[in-house]
Amino acid sequence: SHRQSQHLAYSLDRGRSWTKFAGNPVLDLGGGGFRDPKVFWHAGTERWIMLVSMADEGWLRLFQSADLKSWQPLSEFRQDVPGGSVWECPDLLELGIEGESGTAWLLKWDVFRGHPGGGSGALGIVGRFYGTHFNATQPPEWLDGGMDFYAAIAFGVMPPGDPRRVWLGWMNSHHYGQHTPTHPWR
């Protein structure tokens, strides 16, 4: 695949316009299949965490930064999954545990093939995130029963104190998306 790297852009007007950071790329491993960064603030380490797909190899990498400009490697996450497929669109969410006062972390990623309904889908695994690495405490599970749930990312748009997370994902599959009617949109 072609070379992929991570870049930074910033806005000074609440998202109306964007400026590319002069020091781009902020993270470049020198190869392809390095995509779909999910960046979030981790209060426990007071660092930004970047979860990135090593898509073609089928695993994930974690990096940390104090300033979003300089990134240091933290750890890797690998897991045997059905279909042994391309991994994309990772996400890592801290969620409350129903009926308990603690939290757990959900690590989610999408695979190109292997879903029991046919085609691609989202896998999730519950565990603990320690600020540097993720340890699974349960086996991976499919997060949706259909083959049309892909590339979902959680957005941090809920009001403070609201524990819900909102996922926005594709209603499509790589296996037939190019064959669906698109006129006049494409």
Feature-to-residue mapping (PLM):
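Catalytic and ligand-binding motifs that coordinate phosphates/metal ions
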Residues: 146-157
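Beta-rich carbohydrate-recognition and catalytic domains
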Residues: 1-37, 41-89, 94-145, 159-164, ...
